[in-house]
């Protein structure tokens, strides 16, 4: 697979998914500003855990203040969206500079988590749970 290197100053778009959440990221060189669905990062993700997920790829390449991120996240919950953003940012960084691939791969940031919610089966109250069994 050949990687085409994108000019360093042009914006880069990438997509990431987790469970039912989808995130689209536009990454461009800047001073570390992050906007998700038109809101600032601190307002969209009030807890540190979610913000850490988004910044993890940038911390690995030591570029937290090098890039501006404009993102759209939809579907799922906050953690699913944060993890979808993490994958999207990682993919965008590789498009920006393919040499980041080994660093991000080593940290497991390029793997799409395939786990999804298991469907509810007929004749049971949930995916695995059974109705109470009565012998008599």
Curated annotation (Swiss-Prot):
List the PROSITE patterns hit by this protein, alphabetically.
Answer: RIBOSOMAL_S9 (PS00360)
Task: Check the record and name the InterPro entries matching this protein.
Answer: Ribosomal_Su5_D2-typ_SF, Ribosomal_uS9, Ribosomal_uS9_bac/plastid, Ribosomal_uS9_CS, Ribsml_uS5_D2-typ_fold_subgr
One example of a Gene Ontology biological process annotation: translation
Q: GO cellular component annotations, sorted alphabetically?
A: cytoplasm; small ribosomal subunit
Task: Report biased composition (Basic residues) as residue ranges.
Answer: 117-136
Arranged from A to Z, the UniProt key words for this protein are:
Ribonucleoprotein, Ribosomal protein
Establish whether keyword Ribosomal protein is in the entry: yes
Write the signal peptide boundaries. none
Q: Which GO terms describe its molecular function?
A: RNA binding; structural constituent of ribosome
Family classification:
Belongs to the universal ribosomal protein uS9 family.
NCBIfam families in the record: PRK00132.1
Q: What is this protein called?
A: Small ribosomal subunit protein uS9
